[in-house]
Amino acid sequence: MSEGSGDQSQQRPWASPRQQPIKGIVQPRVLPPFGKPTRHTNKLDYIMTTVLKEAGKHKHVWPFQKPVDAVALCIPLYHERVARPMDLKTIENRLKSTYYTCAQECIDDIETVFQNCYTFNGKEDDVTIMAQNVHEVIKKSLEQAPREEHDMDVYWGKNKKKPAKSDGGSKSSSSKKNDARGPSEAPSEAGSEVSSVTTASAAAPTVSESASVAAKPERKVAGKKTGKRKAESEDDEKPEPLRAKREVAVVKKEVHQPLLPSMKPCLKLLNDFSTKKYQEFAWPFNEPVDAEQLGLHDYHKIIKEPMDLKSMKAKMESGAYKEPSDFEHDVRLMLRNCFLYNPVGDPVHSFGLRFQEVFDRRWAELGDSSSRASSVAPQSAPIAPTPKVAKSSAPKEPKESRKEHKKETTFEASGAKSEDLMQINNALSMIREREEKLKAELAAAQAIKDKLTSVKNRREDNPNEPFPEKLINETRALCTTQVGQNASSSSASSAALRNGRSKKAASARLYGYEFDSDDEDNKMALTYEEKRNLSNLINNLPNNQLNTIISIIQRRERSALMQQQLDDSEVELDFESLGDMCLREMGAFIKTIPTLNGNGDDEKPKTSSNPTSSGATGSKGSSSLESKNGKKKKNFNMSESSDDETSNSRKRRKRESSESQSSSSSDDDSDDEDRPSIPRKSGQPPSTSREWNQSSAPPPRMGGMGGQPPMSRVPASSSTSVSAIGKNNAAASSNSYQAPKPAPVPAPTSSRPPAAPRPPSKPKKTGGASILDTLLPDTFGASPPQFFQSQPTTSATIRSPTESQPGNGEDEQTRIQRMRMEAKRARQKEDEGSVSLSNQMEMMAAFEFDNTY
């Protein structure tokens, strides 16, 4: 580029110097500098009138019509790599100001435009391809340029067509003046005029002059008559072309007459997409797709019904669109064709997305514009007929004015109803889209029905055929999706007219549970512990119950689950993204599920050996304490782990170590085996090493209020159930810590027999658990909260949550609110005098390390 620019500067001494960009734009000079020779030739005129105009009609010419804005396009290195920026608009302005001396200078500037594009952009860039297309058009036009170049007068600007107009005007004015002055002037003047005319045409004798002078008065009258006749004939001939023009204008009005007032906003929207404002992304849709020119041989095989903006405009002008929904259908069809043929990531696909975004926004604004137009139209309606009636003098004219008045009133009435028509058309389009979706769903259901029928027939013949679990899951997913859509659509449509409780309750009853979305309790936000317990319960659900959970999420939160996630084998749910109503409904569904069996996941109630920790006694004691004091101390267990395997292995090692010790301390050791060590309130570890005999085990993981929750929960064993609470508030479990002092443990009367083998199932606390154990199960090792799990029974029947109402006469909502407040107060009071969990864990680990090494 540097050598080429040096050669050009040597050959063209008047070339414009390199300029610095101003706000990212370099505008080359347009006016010729002082002393530069300029001229206008026939070849330059051909470039200005033909070449540049044909290039300006190309759809890819828009990036080259103005100087490059490096700031707006975020290309700061453009002016460093491009020495002489140039554009087609600058070339056109130079031609108009006679900047060039020959056509070759103009052609060099045109070549500079495209060479700059090829230099800065890559070979496969979209702008490079567009530049090649425009360059080919200009080359073809230059092939037809005149070969010989000669000078030519400038015929534009201030001197545009002045000489031709002045000559013709003087001649016509002089002839008219002569015609007008001829009959009114004196005979001598007329004679001189006639003689001058005759001498100009041919030589005449002097006798003819006298004869002409003698006959002048008659010629005056004749001249007057002929002049009048000529004037009348001219007046008669002049209105004829005007009438013809008026007739043509009327024909054009008749062409646009079928355009309804409701279609005027659509026409305006269509014209807006043809402007430069939207051509950045709308240019691929301006004209029909030329598959042969673009090399798209499979386009018409994939796209059965092509559509473009030009075809839509032709249909709009011909009155083919009767409703705005027809216009919207064609726009949607054009965009569907774009998305169907062009894959994701293609530039045309991205242009289609931008076009769709702008169209949706503008289409939503059409209702407001039509309402404003309808509000303005009735104001001007009564004013129009008054001047027509005043001007009417003949009896025929009032009829015409009445007809026009009727037409205006009909158009105004239709304009006033345009908003209603727009809403009706939108509703019709929604119904049509719904019909298409239902047809697709019906086809899918029919296919699944055929498969199920064939499987049923085969199983009747061969009972040993494997069960089609995948087909059953597809059927459930299809049915639950349809139920969710129907429920959401029906509730949305009837929300303004009637209560939607029956619709949602009906959808919930299909799965055997009751859920009232209008209840205030179901709208309350879930706490962190409630979400964690719900997550654990969902993880333990069988596969056949997970489909109902997915259907609830689809019905409540459509954006939470995508079809892509449903196709995968595993679906991850983020509870933070789900709504409170969705989580409450999932909790209501889980409450109706009977007790799970097998794999150690079931949680069955087990009574304690201690009679004071029975369900009735515990419930009475806790209720009496709640009624007297109104608050309860928090039971905090330091030795309870959140891992089942860690807890079982630690207890097994404790039993083995206790059995290996002396018989003199066997009683105490056996008592300590089943009762984990009790840490002190200050957070210090126990004083004896026997309480931490399981030093080889890893430190227990605590499920605390300030840290992350454990992944699983270990319920308390039957021997560590909560005992009854006395008057001094000293009731405590054998493995838990209570303030202000622990409950006394009765001394054993005899040596304890060896511990019996424990069942593999995880034990569970009875109904006598404390309030904190009920509300915060994972923190203190209790069972799940009662509002997420019904009382387990041996039967597998599905029960409604109304069956487990408290029998003490207290409202369920009041009880839950009271329990929450008590738990909050107890947690605040305990946190004030306790050490953080992290410090406790560090001290426990240090103590175990010292005892071990």
Swiss-Prot record:
Keyword Disulfide bond: no
InterPro entries according to UniProt: Bromo_Brdt_I (IPR043508), Bromo_Brdt_II (IPR043509), Bromo_chromatin_reader (IPR050935), Bromodomain (IPR001487), Bromodomain-like_sf (IPR036427), Bromodomain_CS (IPR018359), NET_dom (IPR027353), NET_sf (IPR038336)
Gene responsible for this protein: bet-1
Protein name, entry field: Bromodomain-containing protein bet-1
Per UniProt, location of the Glycyl lysine isopeptide (Lys-Gly) (interchain with G-Cter in SUMO) cross-link in this chain: 252
Coiled coil: 419-458
Region (Disordered): 1-22, 141-245, 369-418, 594-814, 819-838
Gene Ontology biological process terms in this record: cell fate specification; chromatin remodeling; multicellular organismal locomotion; muscle cell cellular homeostasis; negative regulation of cell fate specification; negative regulation of DNA-templated transcription; neuroblast fate specification; protein localization to chromatin
Similarity comment text for this entry: Belongs to the BET family.
Family annotation (PANTHER family): BROMODOMAIN-CONTAINING PROTEIN BET-1-RELATED (PTHR22880:SF225), FALZ-RELATED BROMODOMAIN-CONTAINING PROTEINS (PTHR22880)
Organism per entry: Caenorhabditis elegans
Residue intervals of the NET domain: 516-601
